């Protein structure tokens, strides 16, 4: 059951975010770490040791950690053979293939329209500008978790390809074998639907590995896995901690947290639709967040009833039973303006505007990973087929971060090509600033090019 909050109590509890470093680690996870390492250590230290070992021993360490943590067969190939990719695509049922093809096409067409080009000007005494260059090699982490996510392959790989990245690499955890009881892979094989998605968009370099060890391999490289320039993709706590620790040696897209959605709805919204949208996000995992903001108590109570009714027939009700009372709820606001204010405070990954005039309300929104305008632009379409990538900032980072886009897969090189006259004119200014900073060698370098020399 979704709890109904007033604004003040929501500010004190539901809308209050914990700092990223205050992640609550379940006791079962600490027990597993202790069993693996033979001592009681936290996840940060565990990840640090794994990364250090991968960096020092390469493939040998990668295989050992994959076997210890994921029961990965010691004789299984790390890289998925091309024939296995093609076979997975050929075996994909036609309805699923058609859906993925349409999704890939829409994603590609969306990102082809994103401006991305070098530029130059001759108005400042020569030629100044910026070269836009694609990254050469990127690694995409595709989580398996509670379900395989072929959509994440499309939403990450296609923007990279549009940006011109030459080598797009996918890593994904192998599947659990029947009866393993581990929740982790022991077959040595990635879910076929993920492989099919890779083949569909032309990704040919795919590795069966997950967790911190996969991030370490991508960041530092091993004998079998060449290092990448930047790592993308969400994952569990260990993946997130690993990305944080390798940053600097390699680029990262960000630190993904549990998925979250916020719905602002007025009295015109349909309770059943609003409830369905909240449940769609809350079913992701037990830490997912789904919050409704509305000035209508009548709607709030109707949605509360609908959530309970629809939940009864959903197969992931066990997850919903934890995520709904945990980080989700309904907040009664004074009006839509206050709802927009609370949204900007929370900065959600997804914001759905189920109101009579979503365009007017969107003018008051500053912080959100993506805005879904009206009841017909519901968030699930954004998850799969609308066009923009579903990889969006979480944990309040929508205050300063953006959804995944082609700019994440390029870097900018500044160009300076001044003519002699301009150089002679501005070199004395550079020398003056350099001497003010106490950098005499800088100043003398400028003096050689000044008009007086």
Predicted segment positions?
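N-terminal Rossmann-like NAD(P)+-binding subdomain of aldehyde/semialdehyde dehydrogenases
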Residues: 1-136
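General beta-strand structural signal in soluble alpha/beta enzymes
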Residues: 119-122, 140, 170-172, 205-211, ...
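Conserved small-residue-rich beta-alpha loop and adjacent elements
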Residues: 120-192
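Short internal beta-strands
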Residues: 166-176, 290-297, 374
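Conserved NAD(P)+-binding/catalytic subdomain of aldehyde/semialdehyde dehydrogenases
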Residues: 200-289
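C-terminal core of ALDH-fold dehydrogenases
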Residues: 344-453
